[in-house]
């Protein structure tokens, strides 16, 4: 195999990877994760791109202390972020499959 063929193959692989990453990012923007805290008193919906779409607070909770509400919102958002990270890593790993990238590196692109 000569150098020109290797360069062409590398360019094709790069274009494929860029296309796969773009597609994965588009899918992540459409993917939603749902998290909750306090046994469902606070619910958060977030995209795979970490955009909070909705926060639901059970009306019963509004009668409690503001500190408790704030803590539950933070817990639900943090749970949603963890879920979004997992979904993101899976989609990016899939987008980069065949590229020989080690696990964890795919999410950097």
Curated annotation (Swiss-Prot):
It comes from the Bacteria. PANTHER family: NUCLEOID-ASSOCIATED PROTEIN YBAB. Belongs to the YbaB/EbfC family. InterPro entries: YbaB-like_sf, YbaB/EbfC. One of its GO terms (molecular function) is DNA binding. Binds to DNA and alters its conformation. May be involved in regulation of gene expression, nucleoid organization and DNA protection. The keyword Cytoplasm applies. Keywords: Cytoplasm, DNA-binding. GO terms for cellular component: bacterial nucleoid; cytosol. The keyword Hydrolase does not apply. Gene3D superfamilies: Nucleoid-associated protein YbaB-like domain. This is Nucleoid-associated protein A1S_1684. Homodimer. It is found in: Cytoplasm, Nucleoid.
